[in-house]
Amino acid sequence: MEHMKSAVKIFRVLLEQGEISKREQAFLYSAYLETEVQEALNLFEEEFECRLLNFSDTVYLVPGMNSHMLSMQPGEFRSYFGSNATNKDVYLSFYILMYILFEFYSGKNKDPKKTDFIQVSHLINRLDERFERLAKLEKEELDKAEEEHGINLATCIEIWMNLLVDHETKRKTKIRMIEAVVDILEDQKLAYMVENQIRTTKKLDILMRQYYLNADRVKLISEAFERGEL
């Protein structure tokens, strides 16, 4: 019974904070290492479609690739883009988020992380290039890419190409769209912005290197970006 109580407490803290570190929560971290507690936590992993990963003396709660219980839902994403935001804004934010991860973690060397930061101006230029190229595709080609990768490219192209880079009075611009995406990442303790530079956290570096880059869907998306299909 005590092992189950410990498991419940650990899972509650992970739901609230996303991680438990040996340095800051030594008692909980020590309890997590007990075999009986981990067996109890396995039940939570199955029920909530998530994974508990222990790297560098820190336990992370990670939603499963197909989880609808712990991962963010479209409505939560929309809240970052203002009261008039629609699902179209969500589709574009997904694309930008995936491309940011590609820019950071598509290295071919032993360490897949290829840069410490991304300038917002650089990101805008790269997205401009990609959407301009995608806009020139025949409808059949675009439809095929959308079906293959599960991404609403036509909507992403339409919204991005009609945005100004920045504007004093407009709430929706390319810069503000990117800032909102970074806000999402920052709230998940994955990335942050400093002087128009996007930087990743230790948490994101660990999860990408040790977990997400090995996932089939992430590999397929990364390869599609590499080939210019997205």
Task: Outline where the language-model segments fall.
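Eukaryotic partner-binding/assembly regions in large regulatory complexes
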Residues: 1-106
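Short acidic, hydrophobic short linear motifs in intrinsically disordered regions
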Residues: 21-28, 113-127, 135-140, 147-166
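Short amphipathic alpha-helical interaction segments
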Residues: 33-40, 170-187
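A short, conserved structural fragment
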Residues: 45-55, 182-197
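Positively charged, polyanion-binding regions of nucleic-acid-associated proteins
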Residues: 88-126, 143
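Eukaryote-specific, cytoplasm-facing alpha-helical/coiled-coil scaffolding segments in long proteins
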Residues: 120-130, 208-213
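Short, amphipathic alpha-helical interaction segments positioned at domain boundaries
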Residues: 163-166, 187, 205-230
